[in-house]
């Protein structure tokens, strides 16, 4: 490891230790400092309330599962707008795996790609498991780590990511903001909420962004709006109508596809710039529209009993076309290219109805949820793939060619219906909490390209956990959980594939600030886990070209995470992740391989300080660092005879901000020292530079 990496690690370790010292010193600081005039800039920096992890009223500290909640205040601190950005300081999660992408977010959670949910219901995801939803309209982002099928049905074993939308508030308020930055970044956004009467409140959020990229010739526009209304016809009834619409138009983006020669490996003619665009600026284009309408209704029946229903109708359509690098020829500079076009139409209808009960039976306290959910997923995908597109020069790309888009051919036309019935009871006896949950799913998948051929799957999921609540806020827990995901395909004999299954054992400790002085807000989690995925497809040694489901993947790890805030002055985040992933059973060459984009080590720490009095009152600054160890870019396979190892990297972030009355000025910088690095390489022409330095200045008027 280079000396600079050791130095970066030492500095990160010092920062993490400093955060630990802050956490331990918090009680003394809270008692010693008498805060008179407080400039409240991030009152909800530290999460402590309910989450989608339990679909109940259970506090986060009492949920026997590792869950990270990134609050709106955390998102605002460093001006994050994508899921890849918000998980930079989160344990167990890696983001921005393929560098800057104007379309979607690339994440791994405990080694697997998570599925995106919005307000507790699955989003209209297509071939990629998220929609690229802009986070300006979100109140928080929740990462549920580990199998979550017991409450959400078919999900990956690594977990899910849920985005919670901003909701109407009874008090009038909002903001208008203008931003500008490098790469021609220009943005205007607004958020306004308030009462429309005694029992009605509304919210309207919107954004327009026009920006380029570190890749030459890229121009991306985004429009986002999100109206919402809440009705309270009675004290016992709340009806919230939620909606959003987002439109993206990205021109000229080659997605950063570059050959390994000149990026990860040496090229005798020199190094390829991270600004290189090997596509065709006038031809490459990505367009997407997606939106949703729905509601969240809750009615309290009395005596601890309530009923709640979430419903959402979502539509997504996208068109993508471009020229992309294929390989470097013998002269080390001529690059062959291919043309790829892709389109998707996705419609999702999802509804989740649950009855909640909180009450006592003798010495036992129950927090019970019984629910029925249904999801209808309609997907049509089409593509065109053509080799023999005009070559270009690696170091002086040719632009201005006229390219004719090939006609699209439908490759997938399917309808999937999933119905789930679930029951969970969190039983409290004195300071003990037992969490028991069970679910049964019925999944029907219809392939409309095969004369309506249907596949029906049935699956049980379970979760069991045990926690103990100490008076000082310390909560140790153990838990077991299962997950499943349907798989398309069949064996040589014609037997349909079974769903893949996930199984996890987890033990950990959580801590909140209930035992600390009022000025201290703190939440910490330490978790160890062993996660196994089974029924993984692997080559059938007896029948070439076919697969059988005898493969297995195992992921073991340790995650530590803390977020805190002291006397409205100091905010901090720190995390450490150790992940050991391996393909433990396979008939292919990937046996023993580590999972792609799953580093063994990830360390991060961030500290922000805001002055509360004196001549600098309202002024604040933050500084953070994040280290990711080397990762594998791919598994070995028929089209990937070599594993490309992505090098370890340390990046730094910073911000300065100033609050004066109702105005806020801020400057944020990610990758502060503009480190050029390769984020990922898989096959020989699939290398992606990581995100270079991004600087954004903003001025906001709050009201």
What do these predicted regions represent?
Residues 572, 626-638, 657-703:
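C-terminal beta-signal and adjacent terminal beta-strands/loops
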Residues 296-302, 306-312, 316-322, 501-565, ...:
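Membrane-embedded beta-barrel scaffold of Gram-negative outer-membrane proteins
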Residues 230-234, 346, 365-369, 373-377, ...:
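Structural signature of Gram-negative outer-membrane beta-barrels, strongest in the C-terminal barrel
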């Amino acid at each position: 490891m280079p000396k600079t990496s050791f130095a970066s690690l030492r500095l990160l370790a010092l920062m993490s230790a400093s955060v630990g010292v802050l956490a331990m010193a918090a009680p003394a600081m809270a008692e010693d400092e008498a805060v008179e005039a407080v400039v409240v800039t991030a009152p909800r920096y530290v999460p402590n309330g309910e989450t989608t992890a339990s679909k109940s009223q259970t506090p986060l500290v009492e949920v026997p599962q590792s869950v990270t909640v990134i609050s709106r205040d955390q998102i605002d601190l460093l001006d994050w707008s994508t899921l890849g950005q918000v998980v930079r300081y989160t344990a167990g999660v890696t983001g921005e795996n393929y560098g800057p992408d104007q379309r979607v977010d690339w994440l791994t959670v405990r080694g697997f790609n998570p599925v995106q949910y919005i307000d507790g219901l699955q989003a209209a995801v297509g071939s990629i498991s998220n929609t690229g939803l802009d986070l300006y309209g979100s109140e928080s982002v929740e990462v549920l780590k580990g199998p979550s099928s017991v409450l959400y049905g078919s999900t990956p074993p690594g977990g899910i990511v849920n985005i919670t939308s901003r909701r109407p508030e009874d008090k009038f308020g909002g903001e208008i903001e203008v931003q500008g930055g490098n790469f021609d970044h220009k943005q205007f956004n607004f958020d306004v909420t308030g009462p429309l009467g005694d029992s009605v409140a509304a919210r309207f959020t919107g954004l327009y962004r026009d920006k380029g990229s570190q890749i030459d010739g890229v121009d991306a526009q985004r429009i986002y709006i999100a109206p919402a209304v809440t009705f309270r016809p009675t004290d016992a009834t709340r009806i919230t109508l939620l909606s959003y619409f987002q439109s993206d138009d990205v021109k000229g983006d080659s997605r950063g596809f570059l050959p390994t020669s000149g990026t990860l490996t040496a090229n005798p003619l020199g190094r390829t710039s991270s600004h290189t665009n090997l596509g065709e600026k006038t031809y490459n284009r990505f367009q997407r529209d997606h939106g949703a309408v729905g509601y969240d209704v809750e009615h309290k029946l009395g005596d601890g009993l309530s009923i709640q229903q979430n419903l959402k109708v979502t539509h997504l359509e996208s068109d993508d076309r471009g020229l992309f690098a294929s390989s470097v020829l013998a002269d080390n500079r001529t690059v062959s290219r291919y043309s790829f076009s892709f389109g998707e139409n996705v419609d999702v209808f999802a509804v989740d109805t649950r009855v909640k009960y909180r009450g006592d039976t003798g010495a036992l306290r129950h927090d019970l949820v019984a629910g029925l959910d249904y999801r209808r997923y309609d997907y049509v995908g089409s593509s065109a793939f053509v080799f023999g597109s005009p070559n270009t020069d690696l170091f002086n790309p040719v632009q201005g060619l006229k390219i004719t888009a090939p006609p699209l051919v439908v490759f997938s036309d399917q309808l999937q219906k999933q119905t789930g019935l679930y029951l969970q009871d969190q039983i409290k006896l004195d300071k003990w909490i037992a969490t028991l949950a069970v679910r049964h799913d019925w999944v029907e998948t219809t392939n409309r390209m095969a004369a309506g051929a249907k596949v029906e799957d049935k699956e049980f999921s379970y979760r069991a956990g045990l926690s103990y609540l100490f008076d000082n806020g310390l909560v140790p827990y153990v838990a077991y959980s299962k997950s499943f995901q349907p798989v398309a395909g069949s064996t040589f004999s014609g037997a349909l594939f079974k769903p893949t299954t996930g199984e996890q054992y987890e033990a950990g400790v959580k801590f909140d600030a209930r035992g600390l002085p009022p000025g201290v807000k703190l939440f910490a989690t330490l978790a160890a886990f062993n996660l196994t995925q089974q029924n993984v497809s692997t080559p059938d040694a007896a029948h070439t070209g076919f697969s059988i489901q005898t493969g297995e993947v195992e992921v073991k790890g340790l995650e530590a995470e803390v977020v805190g805030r002291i006397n409205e002055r100091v905010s901090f985040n720190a995390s450490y992740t150790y992940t050991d992933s391996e393909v433990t059973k396979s008939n292919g060459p990937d046996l023993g391989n580590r999972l792609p984009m799953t580093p063994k080590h990830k360390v991060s720490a961030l500290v922000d300080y805001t002055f509360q009095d004196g001549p600098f009152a309202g002024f604040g600054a933050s500084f953070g660092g994040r280290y990711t160890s080397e990762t594998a870019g791919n598994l070995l396979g028929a089209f990937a005879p070599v594993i490309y190892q992505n090098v370890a990297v340390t990046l730094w972030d910073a911000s300065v901000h100033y609050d004066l009355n109702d105005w806020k000025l801020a400057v944020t910088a990610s990758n502060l020292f503009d480190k050029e690095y390769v984020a990922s390489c898989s096959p020989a022409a699939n290398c992606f530079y990581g995100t270079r330095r991004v600087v954004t200045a903003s001025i906001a008027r709050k009201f």
